[in-house]
Amino acid sequence: MAKKYFGTDGIRGLVNSRHINGDMFFKFGLASGTYFKTQKKNKQIAIIAKDTRLSGYALEPALVSGLTSAGMHVYTMGPLPTNGLAMLTKSMKANMGIMITASHNPHYDNGLKLFGPDGLKLSDKIEKKIE
């Protein structure tokens, strides 16, 4: 069965559309936090970074709320390159890293890219479980 939200490299789309809005970012935070919390028994850590799109500053609090509702300790790092977040996720032994970005898409888009504790992009299988 096809994935509902995740594309080839995370979730992307027009800000304030069907799945790129505060409500959905809360739900993605809650779902991903719940999944990763079951995968690691010690302190539950999620690290969030973003690119410099203005919409990231509006969407980030909803994502943090979802993650903390799932019992995660959240560190917000501010603007970072995507590969910097991947490295931090692994070196800080976090459960997960979430990058708020739409990569090369236009400025009016935004999205999420999730990394596992190894600092690598999530597998299709894990993305499907989070959905």
Where do the model's predicted regions map?
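Gly/Ser-rich phosphate-binding catalytic loop and adjacent alpha/beta segment
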Residues: 2-131
